[in-house]
Amino acid sequence: MKFPFRVDYGGGIRSKKQVQQLFSLGVDAVNIGTLIFSDRTAFNELLAEYPTRIIASLDVKDNRIAYRAWQENSTFQIDDVLPDLQSQGLLKLCVTDIEKDGMLSGPSLALYRALKQKYPNLDLIASGGVRDKKDIIALEGVPCEAVIIGKAWLNGNLNLRELC
């Protein structure tokens, strides 16, 4: 199946087989978080096989990574994980600031700037806190490759036609 638009899928991915099934259904890229910690070997194999289609999804709270739908807090910080992921071939990273997600309080610009400065070759996707078009413009300046607009779109703060 081929969609007339790009489809990135995320949530609940726990195995290499699930990723392969999603790709066979026409999904362009997958966001993977928990698998990074539950089965690093499988995640690294996916990176090797699909380097442009795998997005590492790291959710952070108080500078610590959470996973399993934010149910488990790790002792890891982003900088504990990213160098190894990059050495395995990671090209795309989505970072969600848990404290900002769904709050419409503005994105964590300092966090994204720091990440882009340390990891300039990663395509960075910002998630959490976006309120309006001004926030998207600010994130373009980081620069972020993409932005998850979630609640801002659902609440009507963003008009997709206006963004295109």
Segments the model singles out, each with a brief description of its role:
Residues 101, 131-134, 155:
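Active-site environment of divalent metal-dependent phosphoester hydrolases
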Residues 20, 27-101:
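Conserved anion-binding
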Residues 15, 38, 77, 108, ...:
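A diffuse structural propensity rather than consistent per-protein peaks
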Residues 48-52, 72-75, 111-113, 142-143, ...:
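Short, hinge-like loop/turn segments at secondary-structure boundaries
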Residues 103-105:
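Leloir-type glycosyltransferase catalytic cores
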Residues 1-29, 110-146, 163:
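Catalytic cores of alpha/beta
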Residues 8-12, 31-33, 55-59, 94-96, ...:
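A cross-family glycoside hydrolase active-site/sugar-binding cleft signature
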Residues 41-49, 136-164:
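C-terminal helical cap(s) of enzyme catalytic domains, especially alpha/beta-barrels
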